[in-house]
């Protein structure tokens, strides 16, 4: 039988999914031979003190993966500046929901990265390395190929692997190898991320408005999300739906598209992005005085926006980004020998249900479990490549339905958020 140290695994991407898988394989009693490829440089531990987004890890998903990595005691020691309080307001400032949940502890993205990295040997991850090409498994050898190049190198390297795991995010190079796998589509939403420093020191009324955790305000095709992060800073995100533009709204209403099946193909991110200035002063003027944006919203909400934008450096360039997702159908993609995907590569979704990272980490746990079964033993009449393929099919039979459920919930929540009474709808969902 082929030992785990004898078959090679390539993990493309060192995000939450890739690092979770690397941590699980490291914790295994079996000596898995894996290499992680990541374009970024290794994050410095001091980055845990930088403001960033927070994640609520959920039972049976992200938390279960952390426990399986053997990192739960360390996880509990991480103090988050963001509590589990959730507030929902309408555009008039009316509080529709205000509650502190249990069982979904918050952790910053940077802290999660450092936690997972602490459990993976340094030599297992090739930082500053770009994957240039991925080739599917060859029928004769049963191995696929990864072509990579260090950012400081002048030549590339080609290596063969028995298993290639795509953990490489939204525009996955691994996904592109699978002929039937769809590419991301525009969800209809563009987003802007800002940071408000010294919240607790200087802006007491905004401190009270945001609360101890996450504040969501919905109305008129727009969503404002404010969330506490490190060192008294708030992360303020604007999620603007293309239909906040009257012309787009009219086109959507006359298109006859059934939103339940996914985004309308007539939506074009550029029609919204092209209207948004990049200078803080100009963007502030547009958002606070134009009725298509926040001019009619309550004074306290506009004050939050005004202060946040004034706090941006005068020479800052504020760039809005389109938010993409994988289509709800067709899903899942066709199985391919020697290749498997986890996280956004497998099921890119918007953040409207908080499921993306949670399902990504659950993917890695399910895949690691199948590889453990493979390591324990297989039928003596089955070749290693057939046994590996059987393990990958077993993983997909678990992961795909779970991802499909999360994708549907996420899309449903996006539609609710931008419905005529979105704030009330979201409040009702959280109450239930």
Curated annotation (Swiss-Prot):
Q: Which UniProt keywords apply?
A: FAD, Flavoprotein, Glycoprotein, Membrane, Monooxygenase, Oxidoreductase, Transmembrane, Transmembrane helix
Q: Which PANTHER family match?
A: FAD DEPENDENT OXIDOREDUCTASE DOMAIN-CONTAINING PROTEIN (PTHR46972:SF1), MONOOXYGENASE ASQM-RELATED (PTHR46972)
Q: Topology versus the membrane, per the UniProt entry?
A: Single-pass membrane protein
Its source organism is: Penicillium thymicola
Indicate yes or no for the key word Glycoprotein.
Answer: yes
Pathway involvement? Secondary metabolite biosynthesis; Alkaloid biosynthesis; Mycotoxin biosynthesis
Known EC number: 1.-.-.-
Q: What is this protein called?
A: Monooxygenase penA
Enumerate the InterPro entries for this protein. Answer: FAD-bd, FAD/NAD-bd_sf
Which residues, renumbered to this chain, are glycosylated? 33
Gene Ontology MF, one: monooxygenase activity
What is a single cellular component term in the Gene Ontology annotation?
membrane
- Which family does this protein fall into? Belongs to the aromatic-ring hydroxylase family.
Q: Where does this protein reside within or beyond the cell? A: Membrane
* Pfam families per record: FAD_binding_3
Q: Which cofactors does it use?
A: FAD
* Residue stretches spanning the membrane: 7-29
- Role according to the record: Monooxygenase; part of the gene cluster that mediates the biosynthesis of penigequinolones, potent insecticidal alkaloids that contain a highly modified 10-carbon prenyl group. The first stage is catalyzed by the nonribosomal peptide synthetase penN that condenses anthranilic acid and O-methyl-L-tyrosine to produce 4'-methoxycyclopeptin. 4'-methoxycyclopeptin is then converted to 4'-methoxydehydrocyclopeptin by the ketoglutarate-dependent dioxygenase penM through dehydrogenation to form a double bond between C-alpha and C-beta of the O-methyltyrosine side chain.
């Amino acid at each position: 039988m082929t030992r785990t140290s004898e078959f090679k695994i390539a993990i493309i991407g060192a995000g939450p999914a890739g690092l979770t898988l690397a941590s699980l394989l490291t914790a295994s009693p079996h000596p898995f031979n894996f290499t992680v490829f990541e374009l970024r440089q290794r994050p410095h531990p001091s980055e845990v003190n930088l403001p960033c987004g927070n994640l609520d890890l959920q039972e049976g998903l992200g938390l279960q993966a952390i426990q399986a990595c053997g990192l739960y005691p360390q996880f509990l020691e991480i103090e988050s500046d963001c509590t589990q309080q959730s507030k929902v307001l309408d555009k008039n400032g009316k509080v529709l929901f205000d509650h502190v949940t249990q069982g979904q502890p918050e952790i910053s993205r940077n802290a999660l990265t450092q936690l997972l990295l602490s459990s993976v040997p340094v030599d297992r991850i090739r930082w500053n390395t770009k994957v240039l090409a991925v080739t599917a498994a060859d029928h004769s050898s049963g191995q696929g190929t990864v072509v990579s190049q260090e950012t400081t190198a002048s030549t590339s390297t080609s290596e063969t692997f028995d298993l290639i795991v795509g953990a490489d995010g939204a525009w996955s190079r691994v996904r592109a190898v699978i002929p039937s796998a769809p590419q991301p589509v525009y969800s209809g939403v563009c987003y802007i991320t800002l940071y408000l420093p010294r919240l607790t020191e200087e802006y007491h009324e905004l401190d009270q408005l945001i609360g101890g955790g996450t504040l969501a305000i919905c109305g008129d095709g727009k969503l404002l999300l404010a969330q506490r992060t490190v060192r008294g800073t708030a992360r303020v995100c604007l999620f603007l739906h293309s239909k906040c533009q009257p012309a787009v709204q009219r086109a959507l209403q006359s298109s006859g598209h059934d939103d339940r099946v996914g985004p309308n193909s007539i939506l074009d991110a550029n029609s919204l992005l092209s209207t948004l200035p990049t200078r803080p002063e100009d963007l502030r003027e547009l958002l606070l005085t134009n009725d298509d944006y926040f001019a009619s919203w309550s004074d306290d909400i506009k004050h939050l926006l005004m202060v946040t934008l004034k706090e941006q450096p005068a020479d800052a360039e504020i760039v809005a980004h389109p938010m993409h997702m994988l289509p709800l159908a067709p899903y899942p993609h066709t199985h391919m020998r020697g290749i498997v995907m986890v996280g956004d590569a497998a099921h890119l979704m918007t953040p409207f249900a908080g499921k993306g990272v949670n399902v990504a980490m659950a993917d890695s746990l399910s895949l690691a479990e199948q590889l453990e079964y493979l390591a324990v033993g297989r039928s003596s009449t089955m070749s290693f490549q057939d046994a590996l393929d059987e393990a990958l099919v077993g993983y997909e039979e678990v992961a795909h339905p779970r991802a499909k459920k999360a994708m549907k919930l996420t899309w449903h929540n996006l539609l609710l958020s931008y419905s005529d009474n979105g704030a009330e709808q979201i409040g009702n969902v959280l109450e239930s």
